[in-house]
Amino acid sequence: MSAAVWQDGEDIVLKLYIQPKASRDKIVGLHGEELKIAITAPPVDGKANAHLTKFLAKQFKIAKGLVHIEKGELGRHKQIRIESPVQIPAEVKAIL
């Protein structure tokens, strides 16, 4: 179990480092004690958070409402809770 990703009952909790304004959306891999995710949205008016939520929901095959930002609403370092994921992306499963 990594410090970046852990299971909490049925949920998965992710400690993330976000890279906004990237060329494409991608789960990059470990970045120190966090999982790095690159997203195309700019960090303006909550666009990056909305885009991140949508991207993670698609990756874990769940509704956007089941992705919760627990910490780091306004920063690049975030803690995200994924409720009852249907699928776990290979990049996440490798460090779980």
From Swiss-Prot:
Superkingdom, taxonomy of origin: Bacteria
Pfam families for this protein: DUF167
Residue ranges that the Swiss-Prot or TrEMBL entry lists as coiled coil: none
Transmembrane feature ranges: none
Gene Ontology CC: cytoplasm
Family statement drawn from the similarity comment of this UniProt entry: Belongs to the UPF0235 family.
NCBIfam families to which the protein is assigned, alphabetical: DUF167 family protein, PRK05090.1
Protein name stated in the entry: UPF0235 protein VP2619
Organism, scientific name: Vibrio parahaemolyticus serotype O3:K6 (strain RIMD 2210633)
